[in-house]
Amino acid sequence: MKKYIILSLMTLLMSSCAEQITRIAQYPKMYEEKPLTIAVMPPINQTQHVEAKDYFYTTLYAPLCEKGYYVYSPMMTMEMFQSESAYDAEQFIEADLSQFRNVLGADAAMFTIIKSWKRNNLGGKLTAGVEYILRSTKTGETLYRREGLIKVDTSVNGGGGIFGTLVSLAATAINTAATDKVVAGRKCTVFVLSDMPEGKYGTKYGQDQKLPAGKSYVKATVK
């Protein structure tokens, strides 16, 4: 019996190892094209929260910079996008992107699709569902694509007992309501883009090919 258990465990371990895929295998185009500069496109908002587009737009700049890329500031490009009717990114997500290469000099354009945004004050959760798509402005190829359903945990522990529970519920509700949408959006972006190959200005540039890539769709809770 023990032999069967050990054999089963070994089989599970081997299958899990076999399923793990490297970043160069998951995102080969990233390593082929080696984009240096990224233009952040205005988010495509599929939720009923009209303001989600504007506040999420500002969350993308810092995480991409931290991954080692030169990113055109949304504040600088917003006026250009609006004048070129590019503020509605839906019309560009599958279209030719050469104009962004010619005008801005961007090697790639990052598209985001906000699919859900929910706030649970008593439960202490902010949930964001976002898909990230990085496309080459040169070839039009998709270089990177990943989607996440991320819960930002804003719960507060007020101690034990009935009184402590009531304090926790009240503090959690206040903390969740007060949590800035930009902060929650940034945490979502940082988590989902965690397996994105690093750019030229990253510390692991050219050295992360064999690191494990994440699943194309990820669910997680972050603090």
Briefly describe each language-model feature range.
Residues 51-53, 122-127:
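Short glycine/proline-enriched turns and hinge-like loops at secondary-structure junctions
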Residues 47-109, 141, 177:
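N-terminal segment of the mature soluble domain
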Residues 4-14:
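Sec-dependent N-terminal signal peptides
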Residues 102-117, 122-125:
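Mid-length scaffold segments of soluble, non-membrane domains
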Residues 37-42, 109-115, 129-133, 145:
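Soluble periplasmic/extracytoplasmic beta-strand elements of cell-envelope proteins
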Residues 45-48, 77-81, 115-120, 150-152:
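Solvent-exposed loop/turn segments at secondary-structure junctions
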Residues 17-34, 136-223:
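C-terminal/domain-edge helix-coil "capping" segments
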